[in-house]
């Protein structure tokens, strides 16, 4: 949909320390003429430098959608949101990452009619999870030929999914002497050849 505001409506000024900032409205004085409804809440700076929100808007408006059908098996649904363009016109890249490092990857061209969907399987079989490692699948859709205002190889859509793959947690094995517990009246005693703790079950004190 239409975005308001597109651009921050400010003028470049310097503060008392000489630092530059984009000024608007009351920045020019309490009684300075101002419409009162213009401010810096756009998607780009007054000099057209993009804000981080630009990436979010691009994602929301992209014409290719991705859904996880069975992420553990690498099965995803790709939807062509175009109304008149077949998705085979574009290249779909996929990468499997382990802690940000690509361990598998490839690219395909899928024949998906406008407003249609198709399932695609990323080869994650045989992936052995390592302790402390997160696994993700990244998708990127790029142009294969120049279009008006868009060069070849430009990314028109992207997405990322975490794979529900985790290594079994290693069982902690203590390397100290074995502990033994005994109870004597109101006292619980935990001891080994190196330590001796006495817990008073009434007061909670430890000696």
Segments (PLM) and residue ranges:
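Surface-exposed coil/turn segments at beta-strand junctions on protein surfaces, enriched
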Residues: 69-71, 85, 113-117, 130-132, ...
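Short beta-strand elements
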Residues: 146-174
């Amino acid at each position: 949909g239409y975005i308001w505001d597109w651009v921050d409506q400010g003028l470049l000024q310097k503060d008392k320390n000489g630092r530059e900032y984009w000024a608007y409205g009351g920045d020019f004085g309490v009684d300075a003429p101002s419409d009162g409804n213009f401010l810096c809440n756009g998607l780009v700076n007054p000099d057209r430098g993009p804000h981080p929100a630009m990436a979010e808007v691009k994602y929301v408006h992209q014409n290719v959608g991705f859904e996880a059908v069975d992420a553990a098996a690498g099965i995803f649904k790709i939807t062509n949101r175009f109304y008149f363009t077949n998705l085979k016109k574009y290249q779909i890249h996929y990468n499997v990452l382990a802690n940000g490092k690509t361990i598998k990857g490839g690219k395909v061209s899928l024949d998906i009619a406008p407003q249609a969907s198709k399932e695609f399987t990323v080869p994650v079989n045989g992936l052995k999870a390592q302790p402390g490692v997160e696994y993700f699948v990244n998708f990127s859709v790029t142009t294969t030929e120049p279009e008006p205002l868009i060069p070849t190889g430009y990314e028109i859509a992207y997405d990322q999914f975490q794979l529900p793959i985790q290594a079994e947690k290693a069982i902690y094995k203590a390397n100290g002497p074995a502990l033994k517990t005994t109870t004597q009246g109101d006292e619980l005693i935990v001891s080994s050849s190196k330590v001796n703790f006495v817990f008073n079950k009434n007061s909670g004190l430890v000696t």
